[in-house]
UniProtKB/Swiss-Prot annotation:
One term under GO cellular component: mitochondrial outer membrane
Stretches assigned to the Hexokinase domain: 35-494
Chain's gene name: HXK3
Top-level taxon of origin: Eukaryota
Lineage: Eukaryota, Viridiplantae, Streptophyta, Embryophyta, Tracheophyta
Family: Belongs to the hexokinase family.
Catalytic activity: a D-hexose + ATP = a D-hexose 6-phosphate + ADP + H(+); D-fructose + ATP = D-fructose 6-phosphate + ADP + H(+); D-glucose + ATP = D-glucose 6-phosphate + ADP + H(+)
Residues binding D-glucose, per UniProt: T193, K194, N228, D229, N255, E283, E314
Stretches for region Hexokinase small subdomain: 90-227
Organism: Arabidopsis thaliana
Membrane topology: Single-pass membrane protein
Gene3D superfamilies (alphabetical): 3.30.420.40, 3.40.367.20
This protein's name: Hexokinase-3
């Protein structure tokens, strides 16, 4: 019996050792997998790093590209388009005006009532609708017939039995895509962005397309202005505060415009305006510089997009793309380890993770990160532990921090070009005394990314102070302009009628 007992004991010891070895092996394997994802995160942090020195290099590059774009057509990746807006609303406008805004995700219709004092601005009957996805690759006729029909329904609700037939309505068409203007009320489409792909429209006059659709429906409505969304935001900002000289949109896409002296627009020598200035639409989404911190995820996203090698800056800072950058990081971690469980087919779908979900993940303050868990479940990643949820929050933070800080560098680049960054910048003939006298400068900002994503907004504003320094940044005011592009465009039409 003694020998049997010894044998059993030996077997038990061997079994225990085997179990222990398996457990140790599993722990080591788990640690290796965790170490793998930590290394991926560290690589992402390094590649997205935006120290203030690097940001100032981006600022300088932006200012140089602006100068080149004003000097000659095709001289820069920045198109620096003339808008033919040389007078902005003063607050003395009055009347009733309409605006239709076609953006990247939504279209809006609104009516604005103006008194003859700046304090009387009544925005009525705002309608906001998602753009049906089938319209984005339909035809010119289908798209504009849909917009005209939407305007017709809006007018019918407004009339509601009232006798307003025979009244011609003045309409501002806010169009968030690159247009080469021939006047304030006409311009041809240069290219589509933000996922639209109606190739037959490139080179067509956008205002004429809409006016034709309105005429076909028998609507007595006149397209009085064709306005980029940034120009609309600048218009509303200037209406409230004449120190507004820059406007930026951070939404599905991103763009900026600013008030430039006509003598600095070298490619249009002899351009005369009563104000001596004109609003320039930069189309800054296509800006590029070797100083931009690009990752392998950015490269893959660009290569697989419908506009490869185009809109490089926009793809790093705008709402259409931030979610997909985060998705690509999570997918790589899933492929290199199993901390997210089996790879979900949903996770492999481009753009399945939206930037509004990234915002919700980033700003989840529940102890167990319940919102993070819910959103991960929606993309096929279920039952991950808290430390993995925290990892996802960190990914969102890294990607968003880079976006916000690069956005700030873009704004600072504009301020440098017009001599409002404290350095004098590319001054285009300004005297030394003008350079040294720092002026109050208002930057109007609009767009869902800025308005709704708190951390993006905070990172952008924090970086702007870092770049400019405390002394100069106290003269720079960033103002949110909700629905500014639509309201401001209506104000521009009003100023034309005054």
């Amino acid at each position: 019996m003694g020998k049997v007992a010894v044998a059993f004991a030996a077997v038990a010891v061997v079994a225990a050792c085997s179990v222990a070895a398996v457990m140790v092996g599993r722990r080591m394997k788990s640690r290796r997998k965790w170490r793998t994802v930590v290394e991926i995160l560290k690589e992402l942090e390094d590649d997205c790093d935006t120290p203030v020195g690097r940001l100032r290099q981006v600022v300088d590059a932006m200012a140089v590209e602006m100068h080149a774009g004003l000097a000659s057509e095709g001289g820069s990746k920045l198109k620096m388009l003339l808008t033919f807006v040389d007078d902005l609303p003063t607050g003395r406008e009055k009347g009733t005006y309409y605006a239709l805004h076609l953006g990247g995700t939504y279209f809006r219709i609104l009516r604005v009532l103006l008194g003859d004092q700046r304090s009387y601005l009544d925005v009525q009957d705002v309608e906001r609708h998602p753009i049906p996805s089938h319209l984005m690759n339909s035809t010119s006729e289908v798209l504009f017939n849909f917009l005209a029909f939407s305007l017709e329904r809006f007018i019918e609700k407004e009339e509601n039995g009232s006798d307003s037939q025979g009244v011609r309505r003045e309409l501002a068409f806010t169009f968030s895509f690159p247009v080469k203007h021939t006047s304030i009320s006409s311009g041809v489409l240069i290219k589509w962005t933000k996922g639209f792909e109606i190739s037959e429209m490139v080179g067509q006059d956008i205002a004429e397309c809409l006016q034709g659709a309105l005429n076909r429906r028998g609507l007595d409505m006149h397209v009085a202005a064709l306005v980029n969304d940034t120009v609309g935001a600048l218009s509303l900002g200037y209406y409230h505060d004449p120190d507004t000289v820059v406007a930026v949109v951070f939404g599905t896409g991103s763009n900026a415009c600013y008030l430039e002296r006509t003598d600095a627009i070298i490619k249009c020598q002899g351009l005369l305006t009563t104000s001596g200035s004109m609003v320039v639409n930069m189309e800054w989404g296509n800006f590029w510089s070797s100083h931009l911190p690009r990752t392998s995820y950015d490269i893959d996203l660009d290569a697989e997009s419908s506009n490869a090698n185009d809109m490089g800056f926009e793809k790093m800072i705008s709402g259409m793309y931030l979610g997909d950058i985060v998705r690509r990081v999570i997918l790589r971690m899933s492929e290199d380890s199993d901390i997210f469980g089996p790879i979900s087919p949903v996770l492999s779908e481009p753009y399945v993770l939206r930037t509004n979900s990234v915002s919700a993940i980033h700003e989840d303050d529940t102890p167990e990160l319940q919102e993070v868990a819910r959103i991960l479940k929606d993309i096929g990643v279920s039952d991950v532990p808290l430390k993995v949820r925290k990892l996802v929050v960190k990914i969102c933070d890294v990607v968003t921090r880079r976006a916000g800080r690069l956005a700030a560098a873009g704004i600072a680049g504009i301020l440098k070009k017009i001599g409002r960054d404290g350095s004098g910048g590319i001054t285009s003939g300004r005297s030394r005394s003008e350079i040294q006298m720092q002026k109050r400068t208002v930057v109007a900002v609009e767009g869902g990314l800025y308005m709704n994503y708190t951390m993006f907004r905070e990172y952008m504003e924090e970086a702007l102070v870092e770049i400019l320094g405390e002394e100069v940044s106290q003269y720079v005011v960033v103002k949110a302009m909700e629905d500014g592009s639509s309201i401001g465009s209506a104000l521009l039409v009003a100023s034309l009628q005054s």
